[in-house]
């Protein structure tokens, strides 16, 4: 299948209400979010600050939907990556349309700022992706000829050491400006 374009939406906004989570017949979770993005500017004629808010319908699927229902609350700031999709339906003989941002397994949701008064939420800046995270692979020790060693050769997964930033605030740079 040839790709004839890119359909990618990135939003950073605040939730206008708590997520609405429901489960479809196959057991998968679906969450609906109302995300507001705002733009402000100074009116050239009056000098007043103006603001325009756009509301976006965001639909999350699977584990992302479950996490959204558990962790997100009205007022939380979120980062969303998804796809734009328009769907239609008939309502008393009138064709209705709605455009939504779909966040499927290839999408991302990241909570940036907690809502005021929210309680059981993850750390700020925690990112959730629709793709399953790889499980640590168990290392199997083998003898010559491929036979497994005693105890099946399984080792406990060890966390990888994180690189440490350089000491001090200079990050290896001098304070001299080169011009």
UniProtKB/Swiss-Prot annotation:
Biased composition, class Polar residues, residue ranges: 118-132
Enumerate composition-biased segments (Basic residues): 145-155
InterPro entries, alphabetically?
NA-bd_OB-fold, Primosome_PriB/ssb, ssDNA-bd
Keywords, A to Z, come to: DNA replication, DNA-binding, Plasmid
List every stretch annotated Disordered: 117-179
Q: Which GO terms describe its molecular function?
A: single-stranded DNA binding
Locate the compositionally biased regions of type Acidic residues. Answer: 167-179
Q: Which residues bind DNA?
A: 55-61
One annotated GO biological process: DNA replication
Tree of life domain: Bacteria
Question: Does DNA-binding appear among the keywords?
Answer: yes
Residue intervals of the SSB domain? 6-110
Under the heading Pfam families, the entry gives: SSB (PF00436)
Summarize the protein's role.
May contribute to the conjugative processing of DNA. It has a functional relationship with Psi (plasmid-mediated sos inhibition) proteins.
What NCBIfam families does the record point to?
PRK13732.1 (NF010292), ssb (TIGR00621)
Subunit structure of this chain's protein: Homotetramer.
The name of this protein is Plasmid-derived single-stranded DNA-binding protein
Q: Which organism is it from?
A: Escherichia coli (strain K12)
């Amino acid at each position: 299948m040839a790709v004839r374009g890119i359909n990618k939406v990135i939003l950073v906004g605040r939730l206008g209400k708590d997520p609405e989570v429901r489960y479809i017949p196959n057991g998968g979770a679906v969450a609906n979010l109302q995300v507001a993005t705002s733009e402000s500017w100074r009116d050239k004629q009056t000098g007043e600050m103006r603001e325009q808010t756009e509301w976006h319908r965001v639909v999350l699927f699977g584990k992302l939907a479950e996490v959204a229902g558990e962790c997100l609350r009205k007022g939380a700031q979120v980062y969303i990556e998804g796809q734009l999709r328009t769907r239609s339906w008939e309502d008393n003989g009138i064709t209705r349309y709605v455009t939504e941002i779909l966040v499927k397994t290839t999408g991302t949701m990241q909570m940036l700022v907690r809502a005021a008064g929210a309680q059981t939420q993850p750390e700020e800046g925690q990112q959730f992706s629709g793709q399953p995270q790889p499980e640590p692979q168990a290392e199997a020790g083998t003898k010559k000829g491929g036979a497994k060693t005693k105890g099946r050769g399984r080792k406990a997964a060890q966390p990888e050491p994180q690189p440490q930033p350089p000491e001090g605030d200079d990050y290896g740079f001098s304070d001299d400006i080169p011009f």
